[in-house]
Amino acid sequence: MSANDLSACLWRERELLDLLAFKLEEEQFLLTTGKSRWLQYATREVEQVMERLRAAGLARSVEVAILAEEWGAPQNATLRELVEAAPDGPWAEIFTAHLAALTGYTEQIRDLRDLNEHYLRTALRFIQEAQADGSSESGTYDAHGESGTASSSAQIFDLKL
């Protein structure tokens, strides 16, 4: 039955959207804690989930077209249009619940994306301001464990060591 197949596709898509929200929250955690070392991996994982979502979206489109033909709806019907064309029975309610969940995930993901973008822009602005400062001190240490900045204060050495 095509309605079952479409419902299964929608469940897979919901699981992927949930995973995407999790990955975006991971990315946000890395941004807010300054763990930029791991950011490339988190970004790659977000991209991988996005690829899986594209494939799931394509599978959903195929299932919608099959079910739309079965129910007499336009072949390129949206999920909302499919709900309107649904025959008597539980499918209208099931697909309405899927639509509400997908809409909720979309809003949550959009908010996470916007917040992550804000954090990235803030970090970029901070870096640009630091570079414009003209300060050449990097705050790193050389091979001898020294900061590389010359000290103007007198130093006492114990030559007996």
Go through each PLM region and give its residues.
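Extended, charge-rich alpha-helical scaffolding segments
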Residues: M1-L82
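Short terminal interaction segments
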Residues: T78-L161
